[in-house]
């Protein structure tokens, strides 16, 4: 019997401010073949075609490399998907969402691979995009998209539940060995989170991530997170270092530790209040592995967006004289 030829799938993009819509596109792309290659555009090429991304190159590479559906990352992939690159990597399928992506000249970015007959569409994820996230952050009008006691959007909760079920099917690692726990709100998922989770996973054999729901997050940050609990869970589920996700309290006690069979608690790099672990000090272990993205935070990202907008406005003013 002839051996099965591995089908390589190519999916490229900016993957700016990585969210569960990106993850879902990569999940669907992986399902089209056996091996998924993710091409990530550089900030230079993105800026030439559509404007400066919020996240820098290395930050976007780190997050995409941390996605469980991705087998290989090609850095600085061209904005217009080239047949030469497809042939170089032995790709048989090119996948992208069912929307048309145009370059700065108005040309379809996938025109070359469409002509080759290897282009496949995947469904876009409802209600989420980088633009949507930026809009939520800038407007700060959370009352318009969060309702109900726990802050979940009642309109979209059924859709999110279906996605959670699909994402869950990719998380099947057996719980054994040394169990590590890390918690936080993981809002605006970024390279700092990914690096922190990678380091924590390296401290044991199985990583449980505790996510703080919307109301808990509001209690200790004084504002709702930008993304709802289910939205944040979806993005975490796509991270290859995460084995299990639970909704966890802000104050982690010994009963919680015993119930989940946790051996080690690893505070996230951005944990500001370590006193909440006072009742379980004997299992708290700080990793001193370097997190080169420890400067990232929601505030830092917001400041970038404001700065990028000002740069854009200034360029437009010079261009139009207005």
Swiss-Prot record:
Chemical reaction(s) catalysed: phosphoethanolamine + CTP + H(+) = CDP-ethanolamine + diphosphate
UniProt entry tagged with the keyword Isomerase: no
Any single biological process term in GO: phosphatidylethanolamine biosynthetic process
This protein's UniProt keywords: Lipid biosynthesis, Lipid metabolism, Nucleotidyltransferase, Phospholipid biosynthesis, Phospholipid metabolism, Transferase
Disulfide-bond pairs as recorded: none
Molecular function terms, GO-annotated: ethanolamine-phosphate cytidylyltransferase activity
Annotated pathway: Phospholipid metabolism; phosphatidylethanolamine biosynthesis; phosphatidylethanolamine from ethanolamine: step 2/3
Gene3D superfamilies: HUPs
Assigned GO CC terms: cytoplasm
E.C. code: 2.7.7.14
Family that this chain belongs to: Belongs to the cytidylyltransferase family.
Name assigned to this protein: Probable ethanolamine-phosphate cytidylyltransferase
Organism: Encephalitozoon cuniculi (strain GB-M1)
